[in-house]
Amino acid sequence: MHSPEISKSGFTLVELLVVISIIGVLVGLLLPGVLAARESARRMDCNNRMKQLGLAMANYESAFRRLPTLRLGSTNPSDPYARIGGLVMILPFLEQQPLFEKMQSSIQVGHFSASSNNEGSLSNSSMFCPLPGTTGDNGIIQPWLDKLTLFRCPSDPKQESAEEMGYTNYAFCVADTIVDNASGSTRGMFETKSFRRIAEATDGLSMTIFMSEIKVDGKMIEWLVDAELSTPCKSSSKRNCGFSVSPASPPTPPEFFGRGRRWVDGAPVFTSFNTILPPGDVSANHRNVSDLAYGNFTAGSFHASEGVNCVFGDGSVRFISSSIDCGDLTKPAPSGRDNSHSPYGAWGGLGTINSGEIVDANSL
């Protein structure tokens, strides 16, 4: 007499290992696609945010007949910092009127517009304010700590701490001007204490960059003297990025000096960029131990594809590859409002407003 056989259900060890292996292979095949889809969505979101910035500048220009200045502020000799940046000026056109009014109420101000004189210089349109982030007794002005999602690229992993001022991944173009781009004239659409007119962009709005992405980066920037900084290839040999007061004295809260680490601040290291070195390259500033130093500041992004989104004068947003033609980087940078051709190829030409370069749009 035979005992009835008892059937066993479930996987054997070998079968289980086979199933796990198959699942692992499927995950390996699908994960890159999922990650790519997420990055594509983030890049599209970034593109839309930049379109909003382009529209805000167009509406600002429609209201005041000029574009915002790179920075403006106090004319009080005891408080010489003109630090309010262009992003502050366009807040009302980004549906941020309450924040704009909060900033006005926190300090004694005039107004942010360029409506008072034909040349677009500061004149009576100045506002009186301390260095962003501090009051007269070195306290914090609360609105400077506000963070705006609109000014952050979704692909940037860095997040501000509560004690830091808000970051920005979007900056204004000062073209190929290096020396004194913090305080003097530039060959781009934006410069300090001057509200430029659309009509000045004789190269054509569709071929003139207004804004680009920048990387918020906390690494040390290289400090250079004039002779080194004036020739881009010399600064590009310095492989450190970011910004610091000095290698021996790193920044501490709340006055962080990192690239893009103050969206309210019009100093070049925070809210402007040059069209000299290709997107994603290094930045360098003048060795004057100040976060207001001029320098050669590059565009950059955290997108998987190498390059940056740029807002053009016609409101379009286009992706510029890091491999764009940058001309001859051994040549010194132009100065002032010189309207000669940029020595820095298509990238330099897209930043200038009236230098007469002919850039093939199909090459971008």
PLM feature segments, named:
Residues 35-364:
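Internal low-complexity, small-residue/proline-rich segments
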